[in-house]
């Protein structure tokens, strides 16, 4: 049997990291077993579902690279199918119409609560004969009486629920709209889902869904209920712990590879290995290796992974993601070095692409002023001669190469009988406006000869004015 999994988010908000991890685990289960992955949008909550949220989910999945083989399917486009099955169940007697009023249901729950009993429907309409009436009704599933529902969860082992603890679930509301638990069952059946990976908050839904599947004569999929993600303080992950939207991590400068690597390790492991490519994940992933204990989100580890991928991935690929941040920070890259070359130069220093973009501005744009602190420290009177001499040597170069630039700077220090720092630091401030950059030779090479000479002239003028003031 072909493995077939699904990710089925509700479009009531963005794709958060918990949902992204569930999607990743489900995607990996399919890919590790040469199976298929389905994307399904569970939008039956019509009042809360929005197109914007749906678009955000698709954007997040695409950014992460979690491609789907089928879908996206939308539950709101399948109402005819759900109603067809409900009609069959009413005909077969596995479902019934319940005419109990809201007042009666509320009174029943209050009485059960007062008596310390579990709150559940009492089956008042379960065996009533059919009525020819215009009274409003819901449709309930006729849950089995007695016995239990047992399933082996890939993460939590054997789980058992007594049928007596389950009430007759509403599968269609008074307005005729089918309910979540029912739609899920029909979808999983129709789509041939063989393994359901989802959060632990769905465990209580599982016995209800299994009973409906049995009533329909449908196969029962395997289940894996993954634990929640906590903040570093042990509380449920929320906005106060930082970004929770997948696309917010994009905006903050993280690569999808870093986030995927981090998310897969939030509950799953393979020995002591920390860094996993997507291909390695597909080869090694097993649902049975997921830990059932909650995982704590640690931003420092994510930053470390992001640095690793910025440094080790193909610079052209990193540049393709960096371009978004250059555009976001309004840095025009059309007049300057190849962005991949800038990635190579700055990768060792950057924690995020957002930082990398900000620190690369001087490669593409002239700056209005020097950093005040660095200028005070390095653009002093003693810097005038080194700047003038290095400008002459750089201007004389017939080939603008990293090696030639390095030799020109070195020759300046040798001729003036000073350390490289006496030449290098004023020169760095002159061409970048700041006190930090990659090696001066590669920095000047990427800035370009004309622009470098112009900036050195500006620094010489700045120092001369300072001497004369």
Swiss-Prot record:
Keywords: Aminoacyl-tRNA synthetase, ATP-binding, Cytoplasm, Ligase, Metal-binding, Nucleotide-binding, Protein biosynthesis, Zinc
One Pfam family linked to the record: Anticodon_2
Transmembrane segments: none
Annotated localization: Cytoplasm
Coiled-coil ranges per UniProt: none
Enzymatic reactions: tRNA(Glu) + L-glutamate + ATP = L-glutamyl-tRNA(Glu) + AMP + diphosphate
Record's keyword annotation contains Repressor: no
Note on cofactor: Binds 1 zinc ion per subunit.
EC number of this enzyme: 6.1.1.17
Cofactor: Zn(2+)
Gene Ontology biological-process annotations: glutamyl-tRNA aminoacylation
EC class: ligase
List of residues binding Zn(2+): 98, 100, 125, 127
GO MF annotations, alphabetized: ATP binding; glutamate-tRNA ligase activity; tRNA binding; zinc ion binding
GO CC field: cytosol
Major location category of this protein: cytoplasm
Binding locations of ATP: 239
Role, per record: Catalyzes the attachment of glutamate to tRNA(Glu) in a two-step reaction: glutamate is first activated by ATP to form Glu-AMP and then transferred to the acceptor end of tRNA(Glu).
Subunit structure: Monomer.
HAMAP family: Glu_tRNA_synth_type1 (MF_00022)
Family: Belongs to the class-I aminoacyl-tRNA synthetase family. Glutamate--tRNA ligase type 1 subfamily.
Protein name as it appears in the record: Glutamate--tRNA ligase
């Amino acid at each position: 049997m072909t493995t077939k999994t699904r990710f089925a988010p509700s479009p009531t908000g963005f794709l958060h990291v918990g949902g992204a991890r569930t999607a990743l685990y489900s995607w990996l289960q399919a890919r590790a077993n040469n199976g298929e992955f389905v994307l399904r949008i569970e939008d039956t909550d019509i009042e809360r579902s929005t197109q914007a949220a749906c678009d955000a989910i698709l954007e997040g999945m695409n950014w992460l690279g979690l491609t789907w083989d089928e879908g996206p399917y939308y539950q709101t486009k399948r109402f005819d199918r759900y109603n067809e099955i409900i009609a069959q169940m009413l005909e077969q007697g596995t479902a019934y119409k319940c005419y109990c009023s809201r007042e009666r249901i509320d009174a029943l729950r209050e009485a059960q609560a007062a008596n310390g009993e579990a709150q559940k429907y009492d089956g008042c309409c379960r065996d009533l004969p059919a009525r020819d009436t215009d009274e409003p009704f819901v449709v309930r599933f006729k849950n089995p009486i007695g016995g239990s529902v047992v399933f082996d969860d890939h993460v939590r082992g054997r789980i058992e629920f007594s049928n007596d603890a389950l009430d007759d679930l509403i599968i269609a509301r008074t307005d005729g709209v089918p309910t979540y638990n029912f739609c899920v069952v029909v979808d999983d059946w129709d789509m041939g889902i063989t393994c359901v990976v989802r959060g632990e908050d769905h465990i209580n839904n599982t016995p209800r869904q299994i009973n409906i599947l049995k009533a329909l004569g449908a196969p029962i999929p395997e289940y894996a209920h993954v634990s929640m993600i906590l903040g570093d303080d042990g509380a449920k992950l929320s906005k106060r712990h930082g970004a929770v939207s997948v696309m917010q991590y994009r905006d903050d400068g993280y690569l999808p590879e870093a986030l995927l690597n981090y998310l897969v390790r939030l509950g799953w492991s393979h020995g002591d290995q920390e860094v996993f490519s997507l291909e390695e994940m597909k080869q090694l992933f097993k649902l049975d290796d997921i830990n059932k204990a909650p995982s704590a989100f640690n931003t420092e580890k994510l930053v470390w992974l992001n640095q690793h991928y910025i440094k080790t991935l193909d610079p052209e690929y990193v540049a393709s993601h960096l371009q978004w941040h250059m555009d976001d920070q309004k840095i025009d890259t059309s007049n300057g070095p190849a962005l991949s070359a800038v990635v190579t130069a700055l990768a060792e220093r950057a924690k995020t692409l957002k930082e990398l973009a900000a620190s690369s501005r001087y490669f593409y744009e002239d700056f209005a002023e020097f950093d005040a602190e660095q200028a005070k420290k390095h653009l002093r009177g003693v810097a005038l001669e080194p700047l003038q001499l290095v400008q002459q040597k750089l201007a004389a170069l017939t080939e603008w190469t990293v090696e030639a630039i390095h030799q020109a700077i070195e020759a300046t220090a040798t001729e003036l009988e000073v350390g490289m720092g006496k030449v290098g630091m004023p020169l760095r401030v002159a061409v970048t406006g700041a006190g930090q950059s990659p090696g001066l030779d590669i920095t000047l090479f990427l800035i370009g000869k004309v622009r470098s000479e112009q900036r050195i002239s500006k620094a010489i003028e700045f120092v001369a004015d300072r001497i004369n003031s």
